[in-house]
Regions:
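Helix-to-loop junction immediately C-terminal to a conserved catalytic motif
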Residues: 75
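Conserved ABC ATPase signature
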Residues: 143-147, 151
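ABC ATPase C-loop
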Residues: 160-161
């Protein structure tokens, strides 16, 4: 790849993984972040919650309830109509968001170079270790755009695991995946809580049960439930998803 192309790729990468100063973000000494009175048009109204180190939050609700909108506000892609986000001033960088539109998040000419982009301090050994863990090593020299849907998801989660941030955001990370790929991604996402916190918008109750220790249930523009999960809470998850599908 030409040098100018690398520069363009890095500029694009900055959109997803950089410290951008925005007026509704306040820096304090706290946990990962706190959301206060966030409102967005007629989709979200007076959303309040905090995100603590070690949280793996499943963000659930019907289609169109505002899950993706909330993730994009946390990512600073869109600005809320009202409210603010209070961030830990020690946060290493902006949140890392993995969206459903996967191809828009690839900027280089190989799987290996995607892992290195924006992660210059990550060693080659670390890159190879994660590629092998996610069964992407044989594809390391392929174009990311040529991967299957499951392989692209695994690559994006791998990139997230090597990033310098401490807040990871995932929008339907198991959409269209088979059980084996879901298990691989679940295992890696569970490891991310050691670096900070994870928020996952999902319609997959089994994936939520395998990965999350907390549920935020959005309904009618607000938070209906914010619940800590225990190992034995599979019945509670089932009840919430039954309510969602009514």
């Amino acid at each position: 790849m030409l040098k100018t192309e690398n520069n363009n790729a890095l500029k694009k990468f900055d959109i997803f993984n950089s410290s951008i100063e925005v007026p509704y973000i306040e820096k304090v000494s706290a946990d990962v972040l706190k959301v206060e009175e966030i409102t967005y048009e007629n989709i979200l109204k007076d959303i309040n919650f905090d995100v603590k180190v070690g949280d793996v939050i499943g963000l659930v609700g019907k289609n169109g309830v505002g899950k993706t909108t909330l993730l994009r506000i946390l990512m600073k892609i869109i600005r809320p109509t009202k409210g603010k986000i209070i961030e830990n001033k020690k946060n290493l960088s902006s949140p890392f968001l993995v969206m459903q539109e996967m191809d828009y998040q690839f900027f280089t000419e190989s799987v290996r170079s995607e892992l290195a982009l924006g992660n210059e301090i990550v060693s080659k050994d670390q890159q190879e270790k994660i590629l092998k863990k996610m069964e992407l090593y044989k594809m390391k020299d392929q174009l990311p755009f040529d991967l299957s849907g499951g392989e692209k998801q695994r690559l994006l989660v791998s990139i997230a695991s090597l990033s310098k941030t401490n807040l990871f955001l995932f929008d339907e990370p198991t959409s269209g995946l088979d059980y084996i790929n879901m298990e691989r991604i679940a295992d890696l996402i569970k490891d991310l809580k050691e670096k900070g916190a994870v928020v996952i918008a999902t319609h997959d109750p089994e994936f939520l049960y395998k990965t999350c220790n907390r549920i935020i249930y959005l309904k009618n523009g607000g938070i209906k439930k914010d619940i800590k999960l225990r190992v034995e809470d599979s019945t509670l998850i089932e009840q919430i998803f039954n309510d969602i599908t009514k």
